[in-house]
Amino acid sequence: MDSFSTSIWVNDVTVRYNNGHTAIHNMTFSLNSGTICALVGVNGSGKSTLFKSIMGLVKPQQGEIKLCDLPISQALKRNLVAYVPQSEEVDWQFPVSVYDVVMMGRYGYMNFLRIPKAIDKQKVQEAMQRVNIEHLAHRQIGELSGGQKKRVFLARALAQQSPIILLDEPFTGVDVKTENAIVDLLQQLREEGHLILVSTHNLGSVPDFCDQVVMINRTVIAAGKTEDTFNQHNLEIVFGGVLRHIKLLGENLHNDEDKRSVTVLTDDEKAVVFYGETKQDPPAPTTQNCHFEDCPYKSAVKNKRD
């Protein structure tokens, strides 16, 4: 990872648009290498604006952002941050191959003629192999499924060889197999020292692979280790009435001996389940995945849904 200290440092950042709308206000947090962090918030909470600010596309009116201890302009020149979009606003009928799209990740290393060198071709090949799309290299990207396109954009980011990777809703429009493959890759990248910031509304997946969480609603509501931060109290503050909120008691569950209280917060994709110790106790701030089709409590959950 070169000699840079891989980090994201956001200090007292405020962004206002020309119409007077304040997208983010006094936002402060920091992240270091070897981390997968979930950026969690409702639509309109400032997630996209924060990503644009980190990428240098939006300039804050107040505060400062540094990447690897460098101002954004210098960090971008050094290819220190890569971005994996939720989708690309392009004409999918335009004839461009998967190989060419992944090669775009090498543009920052080329001169204005953009003639790839041997090292560029090598890194593109390695990136495609890592996300298992080498067999798609000569396909037109417009022919691919949503999940395949997502892997192409991820390969492009890998080809860029950036220590910081931003991913915007990487699990939207992908099947379970692709989601699991993406999670496995992100965990490998974390072990290699990358810093990965993932914007997501798929709450049920967060405890699976994210060791840090930044929860926002135009400002930082909570930030820290997942086990300390990703809890019922903070989720209710961040999401308010957006999520369904179901509270069950042990006697309503399949196991008659299980008298723990259960609180379910769900956006109807994957639920986050909080367990109390007894039916009298409030739910403890621990999490477990619960997909309605797989959860042992699914009957009780479905019967109690609003």
Curated annotation (Swiss-Prot):
Keywords: ATP-binding, Cell inner membrane, Cell membrane, Ion transport, Iron, Iron transport, Membrane, Nucleotide-binding, Transport. It is a peripheral membrane protein. InterPro entries: AAA+_ATPase, ABC_transporter-like_ATP-bd, ABC_transporter-like_CS, Metal_Ion_Import_ABC, P-loop_NTPase. SUPFAM superfamilies: P-loop containing nucleoside triphosphate hydrolases. Pfam families: ABC_tran (PF00005). GO terms for cellular component: ATP-binding cassette (ABC) transporter complex. This is Probable iron transport system ATP-binding protein HI_0361.
